[in-house]
């Protein structure tokens, strides 16, 4: 139980200073009030039952312990809700009458004891009400002189004892005080040095902070510049990436086209290879055809006229290309299957070929002589056939080396065109010319010259003589005249063209 054991406080009641002492012992409250000016004393003792009954009568019940705490708070002025007041009996009666609302009547005569009694009023203020707890204090009179003298003596003794103790310990106290002061001075000096060092560090930090701020500003500017450059580079990179994406798409499209072209060329190569194999396997020397009859000559003349009409309708570029490729060799029947193999040397065939070349040279000289002198009765027809035939037909079959050289030169020119242009159009033209050349080689031998149709009604002797003159003039060579040299030249040309085509395909593979 937290109760004040003893408390003495100077308190001013109505402008007069009083000393108030409170003592709580168990369930008993002791109060004593003394006037500082007159030394009059008022004292009272109250038990717990009296206090609780008093609070019950006021209408706001308080327990004894709570009442003691309220009294202590009023003396120490620690709470604004409780205050103290000291009233006489007359003041108390007027307060009671004012509270009850009655008129102040004539006061009855009072005794001297009531006039000397004082009432300590504990005022408890709540939000809308004020409650007064009166504590009566009987008058005790002035203090006894004998008691006062005893108190004075005891106080003097205590004072002397304390002074003696002070005299003995004065020097020690001063020395201790000086020592403490010196320690304090040294401590303050060390604190001063620490503060000076801290101030120097603060100044250095301030200077460093200023430099750091300047450096930070410079770095911020650098970062802003780098961010601007980064944005520009990103935009440029996006544009470059877009252009490269377009290039990639274009190149992918070109690659697809090249692959498609490669596939078509491979298919064409496969077709040509198969045709070559068939050509090598199916080569046979056809039997000697009998002289054409009247109906055959009529049909051949019609075919020649139709072929001349189709040839005139073709484009000049393709006609010139075919003319350059076909110049130097006339159309001839397919060679025998033994032409692709390496033949052994035959002296009889060599002698016959040499004699045949000499006869052809003599025929050419005779033709030149007839052309120069105007010729005989059939001279105009022969000269007309020489004019209508291409220059290669006039040279006859005896210039096989020249034809092989022409073929090799055409293959070399095709290779140079493929390597320089790197396009597929030349290859397609080459394949077309190759197919046309193959068809011409595999086709029937050309019909007699156009003017042979006018001799349809001539006797067989004249027709045979006419065929011999055509053979001598280079217009048409019989199948027997198609020797192994011509077959070897055709095979060499086909092999050279296939080799050039294979090289072109390899270059396409390396590019892709």
Swiss-Prot record:
InterPro entries for this protein: CCDC61_N (IPR049733)
Record field: compositional bias (Basic and acidic residues): 293-306
Protein name: Centrosomal protein CCDC61
Recorded consequence of changing residue 268 to E: Loss of microtubule-binding
Record keywords: Acetylation, Cell projection, Cilium biogenesis/degradation, Coiled coil, Cytoplasm, Cytoskeleton, Phosphoprotein
Coiled-coil residue spans: 178-205, 248-275
Effect of substituting residue 270 to E: Loss of microtubule-binding
The protein's assembly and partners: Forms homodimers (via head domain). Interacts with CEP170. Interacts with PCM1 and CEP131. Binds tubulin.
Positions of region (Head domain): 1-143
Effect of residue 266 to E: Loss of microtubule-binding
Keyword Acetylation: yes
Highest taxon, organism lineage: Eukaryota
Modified residues (Phosphoserine): 334, 336, 373, 376, 447, 473
GO molecular function list: identical protein binding; microtubule binding
Reported impact of residue 263 to E: Loss of microtubule-binding
Cellular component annotations (GO), alphabetically ordered: centriolar satellite; centriolar subdistal appendage; centrosome; ciliary basal body; cytoplasm; microtubule organizing center
Family statement drawn from the similarity comment of this UniProt entry: Belongs to the CCDC61 family.
Modified residues (Phosphothreonine): 285
């Amino acid at each position: 139980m937290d109760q004040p054991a003893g408390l003495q406080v100077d308190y001013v009641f109505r402008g007069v200073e009083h000393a108030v002492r409170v003592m709580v012992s168990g369930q008993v409250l002791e109060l004593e009030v003394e006037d500082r000016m007159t030394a009059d004393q008022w004292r009272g003792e109250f038990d717990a039952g009296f206090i609780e009954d008093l609070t019950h009568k006021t209408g706001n019940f308080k327990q004894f312990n709570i009442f003691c705490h309220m009294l202590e708070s009023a003396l120490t002025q620690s709470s604004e809700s409780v205050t103290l007041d000291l009233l006489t009996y007359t003041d108390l009666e007027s307060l009671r009458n004012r509270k009850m609302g009655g008129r102040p009547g004539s006061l009855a005569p009072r005794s001297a004891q009531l006039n000397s009694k004082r009432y300590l009023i504990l005022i408890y203020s709540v939000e809308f009400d004020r409650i007064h707890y009166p504590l009566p204090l009987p008058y005790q009179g002035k203090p006894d002189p004998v008691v006062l003298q005893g108190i004075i003596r005891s106080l003097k003794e205590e004072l002397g004892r304390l002074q003696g103790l002070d005299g003995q310990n004065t020097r020690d106290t001063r020395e201790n005080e000086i020592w403490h002061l010196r320690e304090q001075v040294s401590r303050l000096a060390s604190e001063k040095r620490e503060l000076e060092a801290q101030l120097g560090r603060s100044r250095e930090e301030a200077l460093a902070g200023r430099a750091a701020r300047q450096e930070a500003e410079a770095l911020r500017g650098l970062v802003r510049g780098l961010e601007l450059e980064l944005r520009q580079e990103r935009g440029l990179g996006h544009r470059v990436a877009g252009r490269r994406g377009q290039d990639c798409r274009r190149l992918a499209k070109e690659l697809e086209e090249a692959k498609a072209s490669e596939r078509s060329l491979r298919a064409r190569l496969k077709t040509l290879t198969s045709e070559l194999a068939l050509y090598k396997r199916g080569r046979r020397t056809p039997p000697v055809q009998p002289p054409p009859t009247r109906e055959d000559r009529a049909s051949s003349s019609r075919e020649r006229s139709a072929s001349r009409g189709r040839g005139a309708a073709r484009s000049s570029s393709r006609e010139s290309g075919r003319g350059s490729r076909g110049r130097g060799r006339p159309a001839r029947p397919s060679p025998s299957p033994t032409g692709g193999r390496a033949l052994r040397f035959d002296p009889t065939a060599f002698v016959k070929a040499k004699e045949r070349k000499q006869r052809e040279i003599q025929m050419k000289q005779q033709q030149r002589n007839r052309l120069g002198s105007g010729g005989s009765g059939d001279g105009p027809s022969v000269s007309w056939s020489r004019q209508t035939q291409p220059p290669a037909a006039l040279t006859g079959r005896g210039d096989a080396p020249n034809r092989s050289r022409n073929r090799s030169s055409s293959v070399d020119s095709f290779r140079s065109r493929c390597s320089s242009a790197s396009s597929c159009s030349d290859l397609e033209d080459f394949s077309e010319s190759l197919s046309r050349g193959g068809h011409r080689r595999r086709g029937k031998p050309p019909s007699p010259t156009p003017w042979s149709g006018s001799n349809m009604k001539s006797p067989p002797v004249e027709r045979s003589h006419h065929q011999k003159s055509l053979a001598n003039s280079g217009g048409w060579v019989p199948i027997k005249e198609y020797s192994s040299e011509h077959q070897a030249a055709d095979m060499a040309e086909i092999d050279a063209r296939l080799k050039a085509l294979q090289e072109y395909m390899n270059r396409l593979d390396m590019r892709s």
